[in-house]
């Protein structure tokens, strides 16, 4: 099944629990000092809302995208429970019309559903939609994640490496770029020792 289809993700999210939990991604939370009240933030492939809700709680004006209506319904419930307002939109990021220089912040956490060359259009969209001076916060898996099998896609070609991220964002100011292994505990679908890569970069 094509992992970019709504049906694939609806089937995954159609359970009572939040499959990635309701707490924000740990790397994102470690960057809390970069979140400013009133900044416009885009949460890419946000799923059940854990990251967009956290951003909104810190005063960001959040636009959250996901392809799955079921995930978005759960995200709206989470936002209501936590008392925040978020602009949720159902969208296939591979053909979404990315706006020009719209956001102060883009959050891209484990968005490795798209293989090459489809992901190139996704990266191009991220580059396009950030304002000059805007921040990208990204976490993904490296190819070694295939050995751990504790989350993420089953294909190494979907994974990120430091050279690949430098190829995509080498003309930006890279504040943080690190490959590492760590234990992830983010719901039932991201649990266990994992091969990770973190990026914080500023668009010139």
Language-model features: where?
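A short acidic, Gly/Pro-enriched loop at the edge of an enzyme's catalytic core
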Residues: 94-105
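Short alpha-helix
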Residues: 157-178, 197
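Conserved class I S-adenosyl-L-methionine
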Residues: 1-36, 38-47, 144
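Conserved beta-strand signature within the Rossmann-like core of class I S-adenosyl-L-methionine
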Residues: 133-141
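Conserved SAM/SAH-binding beta-strand->alpha-helix loop
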Residues: 68-70
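A short, conserved alpha-helix within the catalytic core of class I
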Residues: 113-126
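Conserved SAM-binding strand-loop segment of SAM-dependent methyltransferases
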Residues: 82-94
């Amino acid at each position: 099944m094509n992992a970019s289809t709504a049906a694939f993700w609806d089937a995954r999210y159609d359970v009572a629990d939040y499959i990635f939990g309701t707490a924000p991604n740990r790397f994102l939370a470690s960057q809390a000092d970069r979140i400013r009240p009133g900044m416009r933030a885009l949460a890419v492939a946000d799923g059940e809302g854990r990251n967009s809700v956290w951003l909104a709680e810190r005063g960001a004006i959040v636009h959250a995208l996901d392809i799955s209506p079921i995930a978005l319904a759960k995200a709206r419930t989470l936002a209501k429970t936590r008392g925040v307002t978020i602009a949720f939109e159902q969208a296939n990021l591979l053909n979404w019309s990315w706006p020009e220089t719209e956001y102060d912040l883009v959050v891209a956490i484990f968005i490795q559903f798209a293989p090459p060359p489809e992901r190139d259009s996704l990266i191009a969209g991220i580059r396009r939609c950030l304002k000059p001076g805007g921040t990208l916060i990204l976490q993904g898996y490296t190819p070694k994640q295939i050995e751990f099998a504790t989350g993420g896609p089953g294909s190494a070609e979907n994974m990120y490496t430091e050279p690949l991220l430098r190829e995509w964002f080498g003309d930006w100011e890279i504040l943080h770029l690190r490959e590492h292994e760590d234990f992830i505990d983010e719901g039932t679908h991201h649990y266990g020792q994992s091969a990770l890569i973190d990026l914080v970069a500023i668009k010139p």
